[in-house]
């Protein structure tokens, strides 16, 4: 079990767990993740149209804002008979595989993200209906105590209407076209200045985008970790 405390934030289409001890750099992480999403939207179009291209632009925008990407991965999981998908659980499993001590906090995050009240914020960034098909894109990440980032994303298409899809929706069988999986890990450049960080925050305030960052509060670990 992690003794570190974590809070949960919504940043556009990303749900981010943030370690308490990473607080000095928290605002810049939130700002730069949101900026990178908006930047890729502008340069590469919707994440729902060409997710691979959009994600590449998203990662590049993070690099331009001082994040050094130390690891990245892409994969495509084909649909197979009998397999199912719960989007947020799949992302959580990927993060937990690298950071087992986060299991209780990740379970708590899943509980929060599955609540109906969350969908009003999440839906514009995660779901889009086009020609009787719902295009879905989710990302779950963590800012660790050393202020490094671990991010996992996925995209898929579903015949279900957007109103019937949530991060915890059980999809069986797997979407016919499979699942596009992405992951990135990064650390902040040591050359990033306070003025640089403040400048980005001021930009998001001027352009009225700061409302797309929402603090969901402190996570209370669930499951076995809650009493460990």
Residue ranges and their predicted role:
Residues 1-88, 116-228:
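C-terminal assembly and membrane-engagement modules of membrane-active proteins
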């Amino acid at each position: 079990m992690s003794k570190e405390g974590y809070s949960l934030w919504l940043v556009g289409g990303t749900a981010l767990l943030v370690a308490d001890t990473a607080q000095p750099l928290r605002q810049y992480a939130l700002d730069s993740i949101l900026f990178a999403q908006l930047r890729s939207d502008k340069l590469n179009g919707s994440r729902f149209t060409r997710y691979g291209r959009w994600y590449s632009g998203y990662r590049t925008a993070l690099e331009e804002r001082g994040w050094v990407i130390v690891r990245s991965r892409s994969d495509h999981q084909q649909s197979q008979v009998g397999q199912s998908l719960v989007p947020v659980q799949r992302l959580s499993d990927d993060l937990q595989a690298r950071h087992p001590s986060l299991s209780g906090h990740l379970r708590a995050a899943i509980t929060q993200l599955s609540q109906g009240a969350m969908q009003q914020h999440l839906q514009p960034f995660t779901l889009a209906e086009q020609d009787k098909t719902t295009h879905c894109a989710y990302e779950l990440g963590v800012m660790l105590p050393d202020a490094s980032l671990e991010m996992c994303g996925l995209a898929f298409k579903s015949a279900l209407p957007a109103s019937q899809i949530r991060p915890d929706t059980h999809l069986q069988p797997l979407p016919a076209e499979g699942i596009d999986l992405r992951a990135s890990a990064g650390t902040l450049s040591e050359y990033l200045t306070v003025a640089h960080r403040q400048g980005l925050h001021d930009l998001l305030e001027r352009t009225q985008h700061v409302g797309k960052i929402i603090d969901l509060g402190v996570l209370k670990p669930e499951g076995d970790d809650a009493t460990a």
